[in-house]
């Protein structure tokens, strides 16, 4: 109705229908209103920016109805929507409750319209003035009621609202002009004095300072709070005083780009500060998650697998219950034991368990040749019922070719999650960019050594938390209170400490060799802090020096695993094939005693070349259980071992000199159980660097070398089965001829290379004018060339002879 009346008045009186004081000439002109009326568009406040009201209405502004926006990303603007009802009906009900409460109602007061200004946190409300009240009386009552009602809340200091009569003509706009505690007053007409400005604006809040209008043509008023500035802007803007119209708006926020300017103008300060803040955030956010992930990896508390202690306990209880029921029914379960060892290994398992129940404060080092069953003895026989175990495989870490692959493997083994290996490339580029801009490195990029060390430090904190999970600072016994230190608790409860198993530990590697040093130092800290038992599994005694440097002045607990004796190996195989003596006689292939005895002898003959190496015995048992005869199983195992030797040591991909050295040792060890180191030193292929060549072959698993006070002494096959494989390679005529021919050709190439070096030296000596000076050297070189030529001639003759056999 209001819009129709205004439109009708405009059509009757033309452009004079709307006066300046009524709608504010600055905001909307009569021409615009005329065009809107002719087009039939509504003259709403949101469309035109002007609030229209009649003489019987009053316009009030309520603040603190919505959370005001002091920035574009203020979070209260968003979560407040979830915490409170901000619908149009709810806001109207709230305003009416504040303006006319039940305790002091304004009879006949009618709320006609509300226009929310969510950016400023307030609402414009239009009320119809009752006939028995004047506009001033209604405004005073609404102000008093609002102040009284909003003060009743317990959070009144934060939620208190206020109502102010609108004296001017507010401009309803939704521009991106954020509220500020400083308002700018533009005056159309004669300027106002400071006293007049203070009198007009003070009622909305405490004013800190007033800056009169200067050459810029506007005055500035600084409030102590945002609320005062917002209310002044919405209630005073558009007012006309003494022929001057005041237009109030917020002073533009000049700090919008302060952070950007700080980074641009002070990069040497800003970039390290940003990196420090990011590091702090990463530590606060991700470190607790990573510690929890590592704890879960060790305890397996939330993993539904057989390694979970709870699942393991349930399975143990179930197995015991089933066995008890079967025993009551008279049925004996003759299933074979899952874990069987010969007597020597049983004693070692008992020793290892006893050490874990004590506070040794030192390393436990389990040493044995490759395939001796170190992993099985420790993990399956000793720690199978231990609740907290962390297993680390050094071989997986050492063989990681790229940095990201190394970090992923390390994180997977430790349980370190989350990890972002792709950040290495990004941080490296950022570091280069920062260095180009500032002239100094940012320190953002970290090497894989540093990141691996950080992983271990985080794991140490998790291990400590697990070890102290049952710790209580005080113990109450009646009226007595005993204080217990963490060190005393760990000393009294060694069973609470986790067990860290570090497998395939060595002292050096071609790549990622730092892993051994870092693990040794980390393990020494765990032992010194008395928060974990640490077990190292090694193939030789060479890593002992590295461990001694990490944990000096300590005597290690050593456990040496050797091959089983003939009787122990035979007993182990028979116990695996036929777990109980009654079943043994039933399951034998022959029914009579002679056949049984013959079968035993066949197994003994098969075990003779296999020896007592644990993994080979297990492979033999699996083959026999699958249906193979003992002799057939032995034959296939020898063929498999010989194929492994040819692929690793005698293939064309290997270095010629190393292949020739390997074949020479194969020939010697096929005829002798032991070869002395002194017999190898003076052979042509080993003469230049005998120790390096032998150690390389030992590292690759072809031979094993015993030492006497650190000096190489005896050379043996890496495992007993290899001796049979060596003999197999020599007995196979066709294969032996091919391999032997390759050996001679490599030996010829080796001697030819030596002759070339000597001939080059002879050319240099030939340029000397006085040959008498070099006579002794010339004779030496001539003798060496003669010797090498003799070797070449001998090898060529042998190659020709073998070619005739093919």
Swiss-Prot record:
Q: Name the job this protein performs.
A: Plays a role in maintaining the mitochondrial genome and in controlling the mtDNA escape. Involved in the regulation of mtDNA nucleotide structure and number. May have a dispensable role in early maturation of pre-rRNA.
Q: Which GO terms describe its cellular component?
A: mitochondrial inner membrane
Residue ranges constituting the RRM domain according to the UniProt record: 181-253
Which ranges does the record mark as transmembrane?
Answer: 269-289
Q: Which UniProt keywords apply?
A: Membrane, Mitochondrion, Mitochondrion inner membrane, mRNA processing, RNA-binding, Transit peptide, Transmembrane, Transmembrane helix
Protein encoded by which gene: YME2
**Compartment annotation:** Mitochondrion inner membrane
- What is this protein called in UniProt? Mitochondrial escape protein 2
For this protein, the record's PROSITE patterns field holds:
RRM
> What residues span the transit peptide?
1-25
Species of provenance: Eremothecium gossypii (strain ATCC 10895 / CBS 109.51 / FGSC 9923 / NRRL Y-1056)
Keyword Transit peptide in the entry? The reply is yes
């Amino acid at each position: 109705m209001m819009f129709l009346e205004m439109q009708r008045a405009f059509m009757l009186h033309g452009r004079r229908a709307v006066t300046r004081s009524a709608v504010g000439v600055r905001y909307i002109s009569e021409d615009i209103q005329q065009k809107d009326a002719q087009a039939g568009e509504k003259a709403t406040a949101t469309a035109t920016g002007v609030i229209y009201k009649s003489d019987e209405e009053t316009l009030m502004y309520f603040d603190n109805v919505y959370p005001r926006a002091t920035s574009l990303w203020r979070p209260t603007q968003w979560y407040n929507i979830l915490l409170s009802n901000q619908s149009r009906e709810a806001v109207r009900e709230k305003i009416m409750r504040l303006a006319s409460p039940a305790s002091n109602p304004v009879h006949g007061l009618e709320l006609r319209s509300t226009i929310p200004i969510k950016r400023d946190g307030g609402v414009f409300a239009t009320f119809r003035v009752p006939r028995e009240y004047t506009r001033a009386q209604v405004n005073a009552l609404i102000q008093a009621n609002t102040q009284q009602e909003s003060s009743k809340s317990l959070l009144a200091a934060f939620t208190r609202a206020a109502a102010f009569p609108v004296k001017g003509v507010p401009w309803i706009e939704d521009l991106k002009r954020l509220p500020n505690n400083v308002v700018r007053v533009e005056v159309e007409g004669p300027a106002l004095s400071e006293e007049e400005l203070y009198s007009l604006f003070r009622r909305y809040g405490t004013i800190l300072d007033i800056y009169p209008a200067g050459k810029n043509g506007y005055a500035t008023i600084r409030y102590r709070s945002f609320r005062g500035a917002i209310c002044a802007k919405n209630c005073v803007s558009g007012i006309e005083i003494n022929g001057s119209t005041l237009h109030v708006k917020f002073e533009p926020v000049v700090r919008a780009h302060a952070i950007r300017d700080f980074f641009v103008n002070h990069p040497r300060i800003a970039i390290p500060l940003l990196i420090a803040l990011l590091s702090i955030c990463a530590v606060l956010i991700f470190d607790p998650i990573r510690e929890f992930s590592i704890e879960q990896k060790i305890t397996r508390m939330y993993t539904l697998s057989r390694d979970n202690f709870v699942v393991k306990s349930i399975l143990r209880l179930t197995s015991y219950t089933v066995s008890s029921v079967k025993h009551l029914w008279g049925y004996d379960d003759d299933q074979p034991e899952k874990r069987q060892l010969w007597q020597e290994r049983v004693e070692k398992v008992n020793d290892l368990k006893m050490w874990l129940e004590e506070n040794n404060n030192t390393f436990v080092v389990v040493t044995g040749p490759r395939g001796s069953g170190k992993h099985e003895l420790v993990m399956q026989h000793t720690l199978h019922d231990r609740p907290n175990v962390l297993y680390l495989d050094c071989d997986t870490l050492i063989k990681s070719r790229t940095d990201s692959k190394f970090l992923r493997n390390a994180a997977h083994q430790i349980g370190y999650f989350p990890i972002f290996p792709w950040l290495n490339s990004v941080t490296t580029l950022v570091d280069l960019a920062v260095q180009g801009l500032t002239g100094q490195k940012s320190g953002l990029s970290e090497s894989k050594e540093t990141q691996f060390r950080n992983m271990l430090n985080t794991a140490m904190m998790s291990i400590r938390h697990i070890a102290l999970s049952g710790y209580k600072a005080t113990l109450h016994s009646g009226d007595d209170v005993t204080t217990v230190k963490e060190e005393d608790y760990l000393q009294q409860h060694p069973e609470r400490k986790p067990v860290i198993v570090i497998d395939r530990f060595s002292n050096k590697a071609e790549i990622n060799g730092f892993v051994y040093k870092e693990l040794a130092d980390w393990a020494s800290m765990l032992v010194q802090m008395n928060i974990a038992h640490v077990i190292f599994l090694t193939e030789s005694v060479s890593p002992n020096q590295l461990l001694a440097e990490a944990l000096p002045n300590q005597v290690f607990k050593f456990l040496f695993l050797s091959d089983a004796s003939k009787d122990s190996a035979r007993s182990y195989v028979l116990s695996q094939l036929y777990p109980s003596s009654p079943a043994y006689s039933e399951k034998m292939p022959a029914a009579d005693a002679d056949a049984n005895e013959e079968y035993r002898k066949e197994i003994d003959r098969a075990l003779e070349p296999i020896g007592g190496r644990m993994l080979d015995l297990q492979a033999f048992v699996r083959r026999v259980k699958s249906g193979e005869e003992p002799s057939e199983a032995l034959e296939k195992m020898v063929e498999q071992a010989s194929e492994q030797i040819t692929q690793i040591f005698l293939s064309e991909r290997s270095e010629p000199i190393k292949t020739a050295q390997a074949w020479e040792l194969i020939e010697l060890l096929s005829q002798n159980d032991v070869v002395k180191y002194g017999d190898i030193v003076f052979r042509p292929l080993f003469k230049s660097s005998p120790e390096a060549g032998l150690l390389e072959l030992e590292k690759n698993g072809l031979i094993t070398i015993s030492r006497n006070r650190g000096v190489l002494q005896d050379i043996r096959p890496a495992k007993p089965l290899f001796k049979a494989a060596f003999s197999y390679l020599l007995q196979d005529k066709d294969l032996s001829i091919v391999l032997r021919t390759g050996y001679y050709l490599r030996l010829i190439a080796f001697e030819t290379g030596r002759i070339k070096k000597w001939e080059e030296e002879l050319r240099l000596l030939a340029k000397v004018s006085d040959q008498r000076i070099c006579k002794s050297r010339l004779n030496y070189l001539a003798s060496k060339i003669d010797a090498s030529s003799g070797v070449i001639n001998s090898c060529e003759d042998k190659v020709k002879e073998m070619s005739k056999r093919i």
